[in-house]
Regions:
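C-terminal interaction segments
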Residues: 1-6, 65-134
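Acidic, aliphatic-rich amphipathic alpha-helical segments
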Residues: 1-60, 109-134
Length: 134
């Protein structure tokens, strides 16, 4: 079954840089082999700007700049991104509602998201000691 979305309260507590770090951890390196994606992000409510860069099987971000040759650039409120991640809306719905503006090729974001792994939220931290059967 699909994993439930991250709660909106949890998302709101994360700084935007931390949110990009979460994405970086979820990146499936072998699937990203040979891919390069550059995305500009500008958040209208926080005034933050970021470049998200996929290169050499790693996803990195830099705050405070925009790449001149980005594949796509997105302008939105950080709260809108939280709504998308929390699955309260979809990226296309938010674009249609005028909450997300973009230039360039927005499909590059979809390509990036297709490279992400889903990890289980709940897992055994300590497992019971298994007795050898003789």
């Amino acid at each position: 079954s699909p994993r439930p979305p991250m709660p909106r309260e949890t998302l709101a507590a994360l700084r935007t840089g931390q949110l990009w770090d979460v994405l970086g951890v979820r990146l499936n390196g072998p699937k990203a082999e040979g891919k390069r994606i550059v995305l500009n992000w500008s958040f209208s409510d926080t005034g933050e700007t970021f470049v998200l860069n996929l290169e050499n099987c790693a996803l990195t971000h830099v705050a405070g700049i925009q790449a001149a040759a980005a594949d796509a650039s997105f302008t939105l409120a950080r709260s809108t991104l939280d709504e998308v991640i929390a699955k309260q809306t979809t990226f296309p719905e938010a674009v249609g509602a005028g909450k997300i503006k973009f230039t360039g090729n927005p499909m590059r974001l979809g390509e990036l998201m297709d490279l992400m792994d889903e990890f289980p939220r709940m897992f055994e931290i300590v497992e019971p000691k298994r007795m050898a059967v003789t």
